[in-house]
Amino acid sequence: MNMKKATIAATAGIAVTAFAAPTIASASTVVVEAGDTLWGIAQSKGTTVDAIKKANNLTTDKIVPGQKLQVNNEVAAAEKTEKSVSATWLNVRSGAGVDNSIITSIKGGTKVTVETTESNGWHKITYNDGKTGFVNGKYLTDKAVSTPVAPTQEVKKETTTQQAAPAAETKTEVKQTTQATTPAPKVAETKETPVVDQNATTHAVKSGDTIWALSVKYGVSVQDIMSWNNLSSSSIYVGQKLAIKQTANTATPKAEVKTEAPAAEKQAAPVVKENTNTNTATTEKKETATQQQTAPKAPTEAAKPAPAPSTNTNANKTNTNTNTNTNTNNTNTNTPSKNTNTNSNTNTNTNSNTNANQGSSNNNSNSSASAIIAEAQKHLGKAYSWGGNGPTTFDCSGYTKYVFAKAGISLPRTSGAQYASTTRISESQAKPGDLVFFDYGSGISHVGIYVGNGQMINAQDNGVKYDNIHGSGWGKYLVGFGRV
């Protein structure tokens, strides 16, 4: 009798345990096809990217066609997960996506609690003792241990406690976090909202400022800021006033075009005619009557050569040499004036057109580079996916191809083909808008867009972001630069 009771009690206990346990996910195998992403698979299977990565021991979001993945059809019971920030600074937004406003930025290494995971891979987190917001899950590490979801009543108590907290406690929190977090919002916000201070003409350097950060904030290049302020290096100091007016960059090219090309075109024709006609008038006395029939035109035009020396003085060096050679030919030989005029005009026009075209080429090059950098910055924070062509997700060469296409420039699809299609340049020659290439050991395998000062924007495992081309993980794979 006692054995029966024990058996019944044990069976009942097992039944109760089964009904009380969290929902057990049923696993299925998915074979990756071309174009698949972890996020897309997670959506179709009703699970999360983190769950797939944990089930398959994945450390990145990279997957390849033919790869088999174990995928849970149902997400396990809700749980809170403690994670750490892997980025140097991480923007916290009011909603799940880069289109939402930035609340603040938190420093790398900060521990946060993941409350929920959205379908696009973003997490709702709790940080700084109860504050909430949304971050891109790619910038969080999975080192912390998961903890069960707290009961609803306890969550309400925590919220109430924060709202009714005494002023003294609030002041203490501010003092403890001010030094660590004050510079963060400036750097993070200026990367994505550069138009805020666009009308400013100068900037007083504050603690934590860098030339690169200021270039992003005001929408100008690092080279422009250094040029406008006669800086020979990127070192700046607190209190220093820097010129950051963007329109100053367009003044110089226009002045060069106006002073070189038009001046040569206006002065070329009069100089040749005056010199040639003077020689004709000198020799007509020695020629036959047949030649003198053309002389009546000479007195009218011969009165003009007097100002010629001052006119030639204002011309550029190329025109002065041309006129001297023409006069020598006319003195020594009786070369017809038509031939002399033809040769002089040809030389002068060639020089003028060359100068004008060079100025135009420089303007077009600067305009294209600015358009490329502006377009590249629009996609900061977007997710990486193998084979991604944009505009929501990218891989490295898909990103560069998309950005350049928006600027009206066509690139091949792969990083290797893009490398082959560019002109090789040295790092000292590289300018913002050039491409920078890397080789992991099997040929060109990564490409980014150079923005100057040793920085690039690229689509990598952690999404579209800025990276130091000589930094850890990049410098040893750097191949070089290419110009389209």
Swiss-Prot record:
Biased composition (Low complexity): 160-169, 273-282, 289-367
Record family assignment: Belongs to the peptidase C40 family.
Organism: Listeria monocytogenes serovar 1/2a (strain ATCC BAA-679 / EGD-e)
Name of the coding gene: iap
Signal peptide residue numbers: 1-27
Comment on protein domains: LysM domains are thought to be involved in peptidoglycan binding.
Example GO biological process: proteolysis
EC numbers for this chain: 3.4.-.-
Stretches for region Disordered: 150-192, 254-367
One function term, GO molecular function aspect: endopeptidase activity
Result of altering S94T: In strain: Mackaness
Protein function: This major extracellular protein may be involved in the invasion of non-professional phagocytic cells by Listeria.
Residues at the active site: C396 (nucleophile), H446 (proton acceptor), N458
Induction: Present in both exponential and stationary phase (at protein level).
Domain SH3b residues, every copy: 80-144
The organism's taxonomic lineage, starting at the top: Bacteria, Bacillati, Bacillota, Bacilli, Bacillales
Subcellular location: Cell surface; Secreted
Ranges of residues in domain NlpC/P60: 366-484
SUPFAM superfamilies in UniProt: Cysteine proteinases, LysM domain
Record protein name field: Probable endopeptidase p60
InterPro entries documented for this protein: LysM_dom, LysM_dom_sf, NLP_P60_dom, Papain-like_cys_pep_sf, Peptidase_C40, SH3-like_bac-type
